[in-house]
């Protein structure tokens, strides 16, 4: 398989060759990591933690190397593409002229369909290659890598939560399962709305109309609480503060470039840990849950 892929890469342009080589290097690194995991006993927590940190470092180094390679190629490609396009155009013009002089062949409908299909396939491959560059250099990828490294140092990893407006509540619902608590998203929303509504004086000073900058009126406050309970309104720090009081549990929010935010520090016990991602989706901020890194390590090593 490797041989045929290399031959295919050689037939493509520089970008396709680079992307395919980088994919191969990723597979080779994953194979190496798997070997490292298999060499460490599952019950050796200290070495498992060291392994997790080393794996995160190896992956980050490879991603940085790939990013630099893609950046250099992207900077070098535009001028070369112009030269290639001109050369291809001249060659095609000369070839078509000779063919017309010789026999004036007719192109069948089937041939036109095949050519159109080939052109669409080429365009699709170019879009995929561009997406590969964006995935390796974009803010979303860099944020994911940084958060993965921060969590790996704590023997944790991101657990994906759907982006549907309920992400913060779904992430807390997921975390509560570890606390043997069966609260649903609907229950969490209803309790949050009730708590904020009953603590009007504590929350109102932090709620302002985005258009006027004025503090919410009583009607706006009522609508705000109703939206929490009955819509997919996105939850933020005020809702987290309310939930920490409702659950009497500290809630920690891990983020990329700032220290973790902890609400409900007055409560003891195991904190609920959420991951705040600014670039995860085009619509904006998103919350994910976390899980023990050993879950994935054990599965891969078994």
Curated annotation (Swiss-Prot):
**CDD domains linked to this entry:** OTU_OTUD6 (cd22761)
Region of interest (His-loop), ranges: 276-286
**Where in the sequence is the active site?**
164, 167 (nucleophile), 286
Q: Where is this region: Cys-loop?
A: 161-167
Where does the record place the region Disordered?
1-52, 99-121
Describe the task this protein carries out. Answer: Deubiquitinating enzyme that may play a role in the ubiquitin-dependent regulation of different cellular processes.
Q: Where is the composition biased (Acidic residues)?
A: 1-10
* Variable-loop as annotated region, ranges: 228-238
- Give the enzyme's EC designation: 3.4.19.12
Q: What is this protein called?
A: Deubiquitinase OTUD6B
Organism encoding this protein: Gallus gallus (Chicken)
Q: Which reaction does it catalyse?
A: Thiol-dependent hydrolysis of ester, thioester, amide, peptide and isopeptide bonds formed by the C-terminal Gly of ubiquitin (a 76-residue protein attached to proteins as an intracellular targeting signal)
Composition bias type Basic residues, residue spans: 106-116
Q: Which residues form the OTU domain?
A: 156-293
